[in-house]
Amino acid sequence: MSQDFVEIAKIGATYKLNGELNLYSLANSIETLLSYGDWYIQLPATNVWQQLKGESVLKRADKVYIKLANINNADTAKKYVNALIGVPKRALPQLAEDEVYFKDLIGCSVKNINNDSFGVVVDIIETGANEVLVCKEDNSEYLIPYVKQYIVSEDLNSKKIVVDWEYDY
């Protein structure tokens, strides 16, 4: 993805015959998703972000549907299935010094203070009490609590995290 945009949603299957589409939020809540101003779209076959011309967004319970401008039937809407919705990075709130966006942790290599590798962060689980880094190295998967007690250092520019954690924890 372009460095200038952050993915906030993905378009799913068509909904109804008038060209509405399911919208799957990648933000931490639907309210956060809807709070961003201008949205941009990246079609599945391209790496180009274009400003999205939406006609309407409908929220029903925990689902969101989008109607794009000039799309009036399901057949035309199908070309947008699996497209990404993004916002410019500058639209994101400024973080405090000790905060990070979880998306920036994905792909970071993780080693402990003894230089033992836990692989790379492939996912983050939100447990309620704290978040957990899901790290993969070859055929092994490691779960490391993402709390100050275990995170020794983070260098997101170099995509490196050092933890105070052992294989047998």
Swiss-Prot record:
Function: An accessory protein needed during the final step in the assembly of 30S ribosomal subunit, possibly for assembly of the head region. Essential for efficient processing of 16S rRNA. May be needed both before and after RbfA during the maturation of 16S rRNA. It has affinity for free ribosomal 30S subunits but not for 70S ribosomes.
Gene3D superfamilies xref list: PRC-barrel domain, RimM
SUPFAM superfamilies linked: PRC-barrel domain, Translation proteins
UniProtKB keywords: Chaperone, Cytoplasm, Ribosome biogenesis, rRNA processing
NCBIfam families assigned to the protein according to its UniProt record, in alphabetical order: 16S_RimM, PRK14591.1
Subcellular locations according to the entry: Cytoplasm
Organism of provenance: Francisella tularensis subsp. tularensis (strain WY96-3418)
Cysteine disulfide partners in this protein: none
Native organism taxonomy: Bacteria, Pseudomonadati, Pseudomonadota, Gammaproteobacteria, Thiotrichales
Protein name, UniProt field: Ribosome maturation factor RimM
